[in-house]
Amino acid sequence: MPSFSFLRTFRLSLFPPYPPIATATLHSQSHSQPHSHHHHHHHHDAVASFNRMLLMRPPPPTFHFDNILSSLVKNKHYLTVISLFKQFQSNGVTPNLCTLNILINCFCHLSHITFAFSVFANILKRGYHPNAITLTTLIKGLCFCGEIKRALYFHDKVVAQGFQLDQVSYGTLINGLCKAGETKAVARLLRKLEGHSVKPDVVMYTTIIHCLCKNKRVGDACDLYSEMIVKGISPNVFTYNTLIHGFCIMGNLKEAFSLLNEMKLKNINPDVYTFNILIDALGKEGKMKEASSLMNEMILKNINPDVYTFNILIDALGKEGKMKEASSLMNEMILKNINPDVYTFNILIDALGKEGKMKEAFSLLNEMKLKNINPSVCTFNILIDALGKEGKMKEAKIVLAMMMKACIKPNVVTYNSLIDGYFLVNEVKHAKYVFHSMAQRGVTPDVQCYTIMINGLCKKKMVDEAISLFEEMKHKNMFPNIVTYTSLIDGLCKNHHLERAIALCKKMKEQGIQPDVYSYTILLDALCKGGRLENAKQFFQHLLVKGYHLNVRTYNVMINGLCKAGLFGDVMDLKSKMEGKGCMPDAITFKTIICALFEKDENDKAEKFLREMIARGLLEV
């Protein structure tokens, strides 16, 4: 029999001294107590039965008490179980190993791992031999509390003492390691199992494959999949779903469908999740015909589409502006007795809002109420954002009032939309008021919020205030992103602070944020307009040498600078160069060149470019 003497010192060395088990310190964990009528009724009956059993003389066997405690745990009444255990002990009933395992489980669910190990010490003190359930529960508790290294240490010590954990134990530890992103530790643990009495199973492999796919290491996931096949471990539908999802995330639909065909050949039936993953991937690529065809295939296989299947398709149609088809699909799901949920309505309301069809969007909001579907904070945010983008701030305030009336607290997204909307309609005072009132309402502005403010202030030529907010971000340990930097660079350039803009661009790089083509185009434009054409030409050449994929806007900025200087030879060379790189001139390119040529009385050349512009379909005659 293995010795557990080390665990007594393990407990003391790993955790602080344990106070006596008490529920007083746990009452704040009210989230663990469900409040539905059904749960309340079950809870009341279970407690009453437990108390009746305690009054019996002699009391019934302990396993009867264990059954009641287990049923309460299933309904997440962890505090009740702890309280009943105290009564249990005070009435002189001796707990068995199962009782103490239940208690450990409760403390682990409440994130009180120290109390869980106190119970474990109690098990050892009573001379009970901890079983795989005891140890697995403690491993799970340590992982749940983020104590991954301690979970591994606990595992190593237990195994070193000769105690055999089971597949559930290892599955639990692997799952905890994966959730913590400890993929190297997982790989080491898997190798340790080779030659071990506990063999890796499909659950363990699938858990690791899921972790790798989540981290976009699909190649490594495929290698592990091949390894399990070689070892004679048959993949199941969950394994395939995980890999299919991984390939879809990477945009490799060909491999994803290849796995679907492999499933069919191996007589592993795809489930609704398999089809949903693939339909979602097709929808995101705009392949609606193939997505609809796949849904028909699942119906033929007697796999019923669920609300998520329909939401995927409705979302894809909405993003393509096919609102008629999206609405028809919602009607179809209702005919199939699949009730639309809040996400279905949010998808449709969002699509209508983006098309400016606010009347139809509000009609859907009313329909939600008729169907007893409560709008979420996201529903109201979608409406406020859409109204803000149309400059309808009075209506946006009405929606905000509706939101408050529904007892839904506005979040940072709500305030961001309001601030953005107020800047759009030039109501800077209102935008600033909303921003400064956020903290009083218990909402902390995020990076996007500061970016909206900085961008809005810069556009209103209030650059000093924008810089002040930028500095405030740093004092609050908030890291500006590329959009924040670019907004401020643009503001500085447009307000004739080019040197400060260049300095900020350098600082941006020092912070590990690489400026993009849009950021550089702003600086290039400022150099050209600031009469520093030679610097602009050098800078433009530097971008080409560095391999930046310049867009038509960047070329247009440089062409405009050259045209203003009358350097038409350079303009023609640059036009040829951009076409050679696959960047086609647009209407702005031609208009810039034509206007400059006419200004310099180069009428013949201007007319030649005008004919070319018409021939390319860039000007309607």
Task: Please describe what each predicted stretch is.
Residues 53, 88, 123, 158, ...:
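Methionine-biased hydrophobic packing positions in alpha-helices, especially
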Residues 598, 603, 607-618:
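TPR/TPR-like (Sel1-like) alpha-helical repeat modules
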Residues 31-46, 77-78:
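Helix-turn-helix repeat elements of alpha-solenoid scaffolds
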Residues 46, 61-66, 81, 96-101, ...:
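Pentatricopeptide repeat
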Residues 1-35:
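N-terminal mitochondrial targeting presequence
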